[in-house]
């Protein structure tokens, strides 16, 4: 199963498929069935296999994370590394074999092309990510670290996975071989959105290494924890406005610098998303496309700059819809939806706190409750309680992060 905290990412493929269908006004039963099978295979088989590989590579560093018991990663202790890694690796391979088996068992759905794209894209991005992570982290305990080229490259690469997820949805609804402009605009929008989402989340996760001293944040992390890609981001966080409880602070709720990766990326995503919506709705002259893209970017700037983001989103969304109507888009509201959804997502992830990330989404909570019931039934209450035994509580995790010496 996917990680509960990552379930929100799984909506990207279905949402982009639905957006493309709404914008084009075209759908068939075969298209819907094919999309359901492909997207389910990607989220339930391919991505979990990729995350297991990530957990295997980060096994040792994860054991030293202050929230290791609550992160849902490969469990320790370190002296069980061989057994844990072998079991996780075998499970990952099995999931990929089941994915290949679907292609053979369901030939009428023509699954080879989308699933081959998914596997090659997901693991291609993963290889680059893991190489960059291993060569760019674990070198320094300075906080905030200066923006090194390797860390910057890591921030850029993380958007690639969102391109794979999102473009799968678009490609299952639209023949992108005949509409290359749609493919390019959508890929840029998804890539930039992925960068914004991940870097904003990493900046919040970095607060696990912080404590409050005299109303200001102080940081402590060892180089061996390999978290430079998180901790470099803290340079763009407000310095001392979190009160006394770090885990309840939403540092991105107010204004943060335009140069922060999540802000720069969401502005670019806004421009590309507005253009994508217009292109999906029908033929678009080049000049009109440039104007729509500029309008989407300016509207995103307004959203980043203001402290009253909900009202600004409604106002700018109305402007985008009006512009689509003036541009004679056949379905102006549907054409504006890519921009509206990306900006709504920005509003959501800028309100996150450590506590909210730990709590996860309602869908994740429901999935966790279902898994708990199944686990208790399969293992018995006593064994299940032993398996689910918790580590240190939040306050203890904060103290751990402060007191541990650098590795």
Task: List each model region and its residues.
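C-terminal membrane-associated helical module and adjoining short loops/tails
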Residues: 3, 7, 129-407
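Transmembrane helix-loop-helix
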Residues: 84-133, 279-299, 303-308
């Amino acid at each position: 199963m996917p990680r509960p905290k990552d379930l929100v990412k799984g909506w990207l493929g279905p949402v982009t498929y639905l957006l493309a269908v709404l914008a084009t006004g075209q759908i068939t039963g075969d298209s819907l069935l094919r999309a359901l099978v492909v997207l389910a295979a990607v989220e339930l088989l391919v991505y979990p296999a990729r995350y297991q590989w990530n957990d295997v590579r980060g096994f040792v560093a994860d054991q030293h994370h202050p929230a290791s018991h609550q992160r849902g990663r490969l469990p320790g202790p370190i002296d069980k590394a061989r057994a844990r890694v072998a079991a996780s690796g075998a499970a990952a391979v099995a999931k990929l074999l089941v994915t290949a088996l679907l292609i053979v068992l369901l030939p009428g759905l023509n699954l080879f092309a989308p699933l081959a794209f998914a596997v090659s894209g997901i693991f291609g991005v993963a290889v680059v990510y893991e190489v960059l992570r291993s060569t760019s982290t674990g070198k320094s305990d300075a906080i905030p670290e200066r923006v090194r080229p390797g860390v910057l490259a890591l921030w850029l690469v993380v958007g690639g996975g969102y391109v794979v997820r999102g473009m799968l949805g678009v490609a299952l609804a639209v023949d992108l071989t005949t509409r290359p402009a749609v493919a390019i605009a959508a890929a840029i929008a998804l890539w930039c959105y992925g960068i914004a989402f991940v870097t904003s989340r990493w900046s919040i996760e970095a607060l696990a290494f912080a404590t409050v001293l005299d109303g200001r944040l102080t940081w402590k992390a060892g180089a061996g924890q390999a978290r430079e890609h998180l901790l470099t981001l803290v340079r763009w966080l407000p310095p001392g406005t979190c009160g006394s409880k770090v885990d309840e602070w939403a540092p991105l709720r107010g204004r943060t610098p335009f140069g922060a990766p999540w802000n720069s990326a969401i502005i670019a995503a806004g421009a590309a998303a507005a253009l994508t919506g217009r292109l999906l709705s029908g033929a678009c002259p080049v000049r009109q496309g440039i104007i729509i893209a500029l309008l989407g970017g300016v509207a995103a700037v307004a959203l980043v700059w203001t402290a009253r983001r909900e009202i600004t989103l409604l106002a700018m969304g109305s402007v985008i819809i009006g512009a689509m109507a003036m541009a004679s888009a056949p379905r102006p509201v549907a054409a504006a939806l890519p921009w509206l959804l990306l900006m709504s997502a920005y509003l959501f992830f800028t309100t996150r706190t450590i506590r909210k990330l730990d709590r996860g989404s309602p869908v994740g909570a429901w999935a966790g409750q279902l898994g708990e019931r199944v686990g208790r039934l399969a293992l018995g209450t006593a064994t299940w309680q032993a398996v689910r035994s918790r580590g240190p509580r939040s306050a203890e995790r904060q103290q751990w992060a402060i007191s541990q010496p650098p590795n």
